[in-house]
Swiss-Prot record:
Extracellular side stretches: 35-182
GO biological process: osmosensory signaling via phosphorelay pathway
Protein's UniProt name: Sensor histidine kinase WalK
Post-translational modification: Autophosphorylated.
Organism: Bacillus subtilis (strain 168)
Reactions it catalyzes: ATP + protein L-histidine = ADP + protein N-phospho-L-histidine
Entry GO CC: plasma membrane
PROSITE patterns in the record: HAMP, HIS_KIN, PAC
Amino acid sequence: MNKVGFFRSIQFKITLIYVLLIIIAMQIIGVYFVNQVEKSLISSYEQSLNQRIDNLSYYIEQEYKSDNDSTVIKDDVSRILNDFTKSDEVREISFVDKSYEVVGSSKPYGEEVAGKQTTDLIFKRIFSTKQSYLRKYYDPKSKIRVLISAKPVMTENQEVVGAIYVVASMEDVFNQMKTINTILASGTGLALVLTALLGIFLARTITHPLSDMRKQAMELAKGNFSRKVKKYGHDEIGQLATTFNHLTRELEDAQAMTEGERRKLASVIAYMTDGVIATNRNGAIILLNSPALELLNVSRETALEMPITSLLGLQENYTFEDLVEQQDSMLLEIERDDELTVLRVNFSVIQREHGKIDGLIAVIYDVTEQEKMDQERREFVANVSHELRTPLTTMRSYLEALAEGAWENKDIAPRFLMVTQNETERMIRLVNDLLQLSKFDSKDYQFNREWIQIVRFMSLIIDRFEMTKEQHVEFIRNLPDRDLYVEIDQDKITQVLDNIISNALKYSPEGGHVTFSIDVNEEEELLYISVKDEGIGIPKKDVEKVFDRFYRVDKARTRKLGGTGLGLAIAKEMVQAHGGDIWADSIEGKGTTITFTLPYKEEQEDDWDEA
């Protein structure tokens, strides 16, 4: 923040206000004082001049009351006038008798005007009104201000004998006023200087604490709460400093609490498995966590430059305002690592107390597995319904035929009953397989594990199939000639091998080969047990699906051979329950190899009981 200049500061403004107040006060006082003094001096001067004129009038009146002749009177009046003009301020004095004859005058040319008639209207007005005349004016010739006073001279019986005319200079009066004005101006200037200094000092007592608070506010903006404002007194500014320090402590506590909550929230968001996206009120992304980046398969830099509608791929059908009003969750399909991922997005509006919307929170869940399970469940129900409907439909048709009289036909009745029996057994197998899978799904199963010599165990199973097989298929055994022990449930692994070998025989052509192998991986302590046929094989796109429930590569042929599509699914559950794994390798048209693993031990002290 830039420093405030002196002429823009409070200190200058306070000082200026003080100075202006003094100037206004001194102007008002000065004008009033000067006017009053001027009036007083002029009034005193007029009174003094009138007093002298009255004295002069008295002497002239006495001369006219004397018995002297007119010539003597005129000489005495001239002498009296000359004595009166010895005063510096009297510039001119004249006496005119009632016949308008100038008896005497103090003008330089007074002798010339003496004895002459005057035509000045002032004397006519005085003689007619018997009133004095007084006027002030500025003489442009001499450039001085003068006072003109004319007064009638009357006897005791109020008879006018003449009039006195006086012109007196007022420069002394105005010189005194000039001196007074100079003194007043000097005093005002000195008062202004003292006021300015005092104003600066007083302003600093206010601005210094305010400047300290300003510095503290700047430190608060930087996050520094350690600095305190100094308290200079107990007045309002001191109380403000105390309040400011209290505010600093409160802000520090609030900042610490907010920072703690922010860190907690950041930790929660960072370690959430769900994706979280936050936007501002315009829909621009301001925050998103790592799971959101991973789920959307986008970099953080790219995401922060996109609006949320574009990031979620909704820009063609939705605006940000539509998402704000969105109440239900949405499903998105994102292609990630060449796989389709299904995401569920829930939106929550960030809203202030007064209702203003500040942004949007989007929480993203990966529901690919859930959707897959829902799809599998739907397919499972459809498959079960289909598998049960087919034999039930067949049984119903044959039973209706028998009920309509076919039971009396000795050739048809046994065949219809055999078909009905076969379909019944098929449904029983299907239900048993479903119950077995249900137990695996609910973990409601128990194994009777025991240590078995796997080579001998597998040889017995192969022997059984070799004796009961109907096809002309040759069995090839690639079995190790050493003792290898596994801890298994014989019934369950027998069922696994039965399912695998049965499938190999079903799809093997006449004259084909079925190869049985056991390979040992000593590092992993695993046995690799495989059954290879030379059947029709499995298309490459379907190899991973053969262990799915109800999956058949050739549905018509599998159903014809009596399969339910659950054998390999059950085998997978059983092998995984024994800590192993199972998979298929196939080349279409050349055959299929089913391999599963089991943990083993090289030796076993306990005696092996033959099955």
